[in-house]
Amino acid sequence: MRKILALILAFVAVPAFADHPGDRLDEVMEQKEPAFKAVDLGTVPSLELLGPDGASYDLDSLSDQVIVLSFVPADCGAPCAEQQALLAKVRDGVNSSPMLSMVTFLIVSDAEDPAFGATAENIVVVRPKTLIKTPIEEYRALSPDAPDAPLVHIIARGNRHAGIFEGALFRQINMILYVNGLTNEH
């Protein structure tokens, strides 16, 4: 499956380089992907997190990475499960490419025993120090017209909030291409 995704990405990426959107990445993605919204902010709302080892976890430690941030409250149910299944496919595409070392998938969950599929070196599951509802509301406020579906926040290098993918309706290749575009930013 990974080889197939890598081949698809290779064939899609070659034409993308010929007409790479560069500075127009957000504009191009908004035209291609109805479930995407550009939200270009210089910073992100602060998150008080506990890492897998129980110690404080700071987003600043990932400032050299593109972060794919998702929130998975224990009571979310099917909407979050569907989104995490789609994100697993995105991870497979990213992790079978040179982007593996440039992208971190950060999952914030208050579930007692969160299990989000296969593990990889760039998947980090953290817990909020406060009720998970608080950071979800702070990040949802970045896109007040978004539906009630869970949101995936894409944070560019330097902790710049770049965009939001809504629910599980986006095409995985579009998220992969968007993340790829952000890894190529200088």
Predicted feature descriptions by range:
Residues M1-L50, E185-H186:
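N-terminal targeting signals for export/organelle localization
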Residues V44-P45, I67, A149-L151:
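Short loop/turn microsegments at loop-to-beta-strand junctions
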Residues Y57-L87:
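Short active-site neighborhood of thiol/selenol oxidoreductases, capturing the structured segment around
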Residues L62-D64, P73-A74, V108-E112, P128-T130, ...:
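Solvent-exposed coil/turn segments that connect beta secondary-structure elements
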Residues V66, V72, R91-P98, I136-S143, ...:
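Sec/Tat-exported extracytoplasmic proteins
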Residues E82-P135:
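Structural microenvironment flanking redox-active thiols in thiol-disulfide oxidoreductases
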Residues E121-I123, K133, E137-H153:
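Structural micro-motif
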Residues A146-H186:
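Thiol-/selenol-based redox modules, centered on thioredoxin-like
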